[in-house]
Design a protein with these regions (language model features):
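N-terminal glycine-rich phosphate/pyrophosphate-binding loop and immediately adjacent elements
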Residues: 3-142, 303
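A conserved FAD-binding loop/helix module that cradles the flavin
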Residues: 482-503
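FAD-dependent oxidoreductase catalytic-site/capping-region signature
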Residues: 361-455
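A glycine-rich dinucleotide-binding beta-alpha-beta segment and adjacent secondary-structure elements
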Residues: 185, 189-202, 355-363, 422-485
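Mid-domain catalytic core of redox enzymes
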Residues: 255-377
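Rossmann-like flavin
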Residues: 98-207
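Short beta-strand to alpha-helix junction loop
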Residues: 164-175, 219-241, 400-408
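Helical element adjacent to the flavin cofactor pocket in flavoenzyme catalytic cores
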Residues: 215-265
Length: 506
C-alpha cells in the first residue's frame, strides 16, 4: 500500500490538535489528524461516566480560563462559557470550635467583605486581598496578548509589562514567601496558594509553584475560570465542526507507532499498518510519548499529583456552617487547604505517605449549567460534583494502585465530611475515581501529569534562539499540545502557536 501525502499530519485529536489543524487548513494546508482512541477530544471529552444515569460529565478537564477570545473569533467557534457569581467558599473551624466559612464572590461585594472581617475584624486581610489581585490582574492584562506571539526573552517581557514589583513576586521570589508576606491568615494564604498547586507536586517555596500560579491567573487577561455550557465536550464538538468544514481529515483508532524523518518529509506509521507522508508532523501527545515513538530519551518531569473524582449526587449535602449549599458549591469549594495543611501534606506525600486528610477542592457544574443532566435527573434534584485532591503523586500509587486509590478516596472524603452535616457518601448516586496512573492508562498522560511535563515560564531566556515554544530538535516536528511552552490547561494556545510555527517555516 502506498503512503498517502499531506502537508501536515497531527498525532492526537485533543483540543489543541484540533485548533492547530483548523488554523493550518484555513491557510490552505492539507491536514490529517490521527487519534489513537475511538473518542475525539482527549482530556477535553465529555462522557456518560455513570452507567444507568443520563449525565454527560467533563471527565478530565472542567473549567475554562486560558482559551483566548482571539482563537474563538479566528476559528468562528460557537462556544459559550458562563461566569460563576461565586468565586470560592472555604469552610473552617474557629479556635472556639465554631463552623464558619470564607466566602469570596467573583466581584468584591459586601458579603465578601463581611466574610473577610470574620477572619480579620480590622479589614486589613480583605484590603490585602483586593490589592494583591488588582496587581495580578494588571499583570495578566499585559501578558495575555503575548501568549499568541513568538516567545519574548525574559528581559523583553519584563520591560514590556513594566510592573517591576509584580514581576519580582510572581517570577523571581518563591510564591510561598510572597503569600506569607502579603497575608496573615493561614486560611486566606491557603486559598491563594492553591492556584500554585493544581496538578503540580511542589512546595509553596518552589518556583514550579510560581509558574503554576501564573498560568492559573493570566487566562484571557482576566484569570476568570468559567463553566463551559454543555460541558467541555461542547468545545470539542465545535472544534470538530470547524476542523472538518475547513477540510481537516480525522481518523480514529490510529495509534502512531513510528516516525521517520528526513530532510524532505516525515513518514508516519500507525498500529493498523497505514503509512502517511507529510512535510510537517505535529504532536498533540506529551513530549515523553513523542520521544518514546522517536526512540529518544524522555524529558524528566514531576509526577502527576492529583486525584480526580467525578460524582453524581442525589442532592447537595448540607454544611455545618449553615451556608446554603447552592452558594457553597457554586464556586470552588476548598477543604483542608490552609497554607500549613498544604505544606504538611506535601511533605507527607514526598516522604511516601498517603496524607490522612488530603487538601481538596471541587465545584458543582450543574449549579451553573444543568444542561449536562437529563431533565429527569435535574427535576429530581441531582447534581454533579467534581473533586480534585492535591498532593497525591503517582509514586504513592505505584505499589498497589487499587489499594492506594481506596485510601486516597477515604482521605479525600475525610477532608470533605469534616464540614458536612452528613457524610457525602449518603448522597452519592454514582462515582468515578481516577488516580495519576489511571490518567496515564486512559489518556497517555505521563505519570498522570495533566500538563504533560513541567510547566515553564511564558518567555525564553535571554540569548536563546527565537521560537514559538513548540519546536523540537527536528525542524519538521513540532509540539502542539500541553507540553509546549505556554501549554497546559484548556487553551488552544499551543495549537495556535504550532500552526503559526509551521506556516512561518514555509
Amino acid at each position: 500500500m502506498s503512503a498517502k501525502n499531506y502537508d501536515v499530519v497531527i498525532m492526537g485529536a485533543g483540543h489543541n490538535g484540533l485548533v492547530a489543524a483548523t488554523y493550518l487548513a484555513k491557510a490552505g494546508k492539507s491536514v490529517l489528524i490521527l487519534e489513537a482512541n475511538d473518542e475525539i477530544g482527549g482530556a477535553t471529552q465529555s462522557v456518560q461516566a455513570f452507567p444507568g444515569f443520563d449525565a454527560r460529565v467533563s471527565r478530565y478537564s472542567y473549567l475554562v480560563a486560558l482559551l483566548p477570545d482571539k482563537i474563538i473569533k479566528d476559528l468562528q467557534l460557537t462556544f459559550e462559557t458562563i461566569s460563576r457569581d461565586v468565586s470560592s467558599f472555604t469552610p473552617y473551624s474557629t479556635t472556639s470550635g465554631e463552623n464558619e466559612g470564607l466566602y469570596v464572590s467573583r466581584n468584591w461585594d459586601s458579603k465578601t467583605e463581611e466574610s473577610f472581617k470574620e477572619i480579620d475584624p480590622t479589614g486589613n486581610e480583605g484590603r490585602a486581598w483586593q490589592d494583591f489581585y488588582a496587581e495580578v490582574a494588571e499583570f495578566a492584562h499585559k501578558i495575555a496578548p503575548t501568549l499568541l506571539q513568538p516567545l519574548q526573552t525574559r528581559s523583553q517581557l519584563r520591560e514590556q509589562i513594566n510592573l517591576p514589583k509584580v514581576w519580582k513576586y510572581l517570577i523571581e521570589d518563591p510564591i510561598g514567601e510572597v503569600i506569607c508576606e502579603r497575608f496573615k491568615s493561614d486560611i486566606v494564604r491557603g486559598v491563594v496558594l492553591t492556584d500554585a498547586l493544581i496538578g503540580t507536586f511542589a512546595s509553596a517555596y518552589d518556583l514550579q509553584a510560581n509558574i503554576c500560579f501564573l498560568y492559573h491567573l493570566i487566562g484571557n487577561g482576566t484569570g476568570e475560570w468559567k463553566v463551559p455550557r454543555g460541558g467541555m465536550g461542547a468545545l470539542v464538538n465545535e472544534l470538530v465542526r470547524v476542523a472538518t468544514e475547513s477540510g481537516v481529515e480525522i481518523r480514529t483508532n490510529q495509534k502512531v507507532v513510528a516516525i521517520e524523518s528526513t530532510s524532505d518529509y516525515v513518514k508516519v506509521k500507525t498500529s493498523s499498518g497505514d503509512e502517511f507522508i507529510a512535510s510537517h508532523f505535529l504532536s498533540n501527545a506529551a513530549p515523553g510519548v513523542l520521544a518514546e515513538i522517536r526512540g529518544k530519551k524522555k524529558p524528566e518531569s514531576l509526577d502527576g499529583a492529583q486525584l480526580k473524582i467525578n460524582i453524581l449526587l442525589k442532592r447537595l449535602p448540607q454544611l455545618k456552617s449553615g451556608i446554603d449549599p447552592q452558594l457553597a458549591f457554586a464556586g470552588t469549594f476548598h477543604a483542608n487547604e490552609s497554607f500549613t495543611q498544604c505544606e504538611v501534606t506535601y511533605n507527607e506525600a514526598k516522604g511516601g505517605k498517603m496524607p490522612t486528610k488530603l487538601p481538596i477542592e471541587m465545584y458543582c457544574h450543574t449549579l451553573t449549567d444543568p444542561s449536562i443532566l437529563s431533565p429527569e435527573l435535574s427535576a429530581a434534584g441531582f447534581h454533579t460534583l467534581t473533586l480534585f485532591a492535591l498532593h497525591t503523586p503517582a509514586s504513592l500509587f505505584d505499589k498497589d494502585n487499587d489499594a492506594a486509590r481506596a485510601a486516597a478516596l477515604e482521605s479525600a472524603f475525610a477532608s470533605l465530611n469534616e464540614y458536612l452535616v452528613e457524610p457525602i457518601q449518603d448522597v452519592i448516586a454514582a462515582i468515578e475515581i481516577k488516580t495519576p496512573l489511571d490518567l496515564e492508562e486512559a489518556i497517555a498522560l505521563p505519570r498522570g501529569n495533566i500538563f504533560h511535563k513541567d510547566l515553564q515560564f511564558p518567555f525564553r531566556e535571554d540569548g536563546s534562539q527565537p521560537s514559538w515554544g513548540v519546536e523540537t530538535d527536528d525542524p519538521r516536528i513540532f509540539i502542539c499540545g500541553a507540553g509546549a511552552t505556554r501549554g497546559g490547561g484548556v487553551s488552544g494556545i499551543p495549537g495556535h502557536n504550532a500552526a503559526m510555527a509551521v506556516l512561518g517555516s514555509n
